[in-house]
Amino acid sequence: YLSRRFLAQITRHQNEVKYMSASLQYSDYSGVEDFVIPYDLMGTGQEKEYLKQCSSSMKNYEELVKAGVDNNSAGYCASQGMRNILLISATPYQWKHMIRQRVCRRNTKETRYVMLKIWEQLISQNGELFSDCGPFCMNGGCEEGKMTCGKCIPPKMSPTDIIRVDFPKLCEETILEEGEADEDSTD
């Protein structure tokens, strides 16, 4: 699940890309309490306050729906941190293009992390085709001009290596991937 903020960013890519997402326009999100915690809030002690604010937004949404306001109008109350399901279909060329742009250190951390995870998966499917997907700084030089971050990612770093360097808080704990059993789900 991704945040609605990620959805707003990634859907800027329109050529040879298709998206299917849950919709605030048609679906009733009353009772939803599932939010992405921004990376820079992790470990700050501010997580509970952030989640409280997100929850408050969704309670306002729910009250509007109960009062007869349509889902679309009530959706303006929804937090950008609300988790959202998103399916993306793209040509290999577009995946490479999106990854090059979106794993750049100038992007939001959630966008970078999600695109690095997608890059990991694409490499596992076809390493030859997707091994050179890194940001422009890894493949010759930054194209941001005076807007450069000044922190080039070394060539030959894998997406897994970049995650370890740039997202250490997410590497500190074991995160169960879909399909893996935890102690509560084994017989």
Give residue ranges: language-model regions.
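Family-specific signature for flavin-dependent thymidylate synthase
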Residues: 1-187
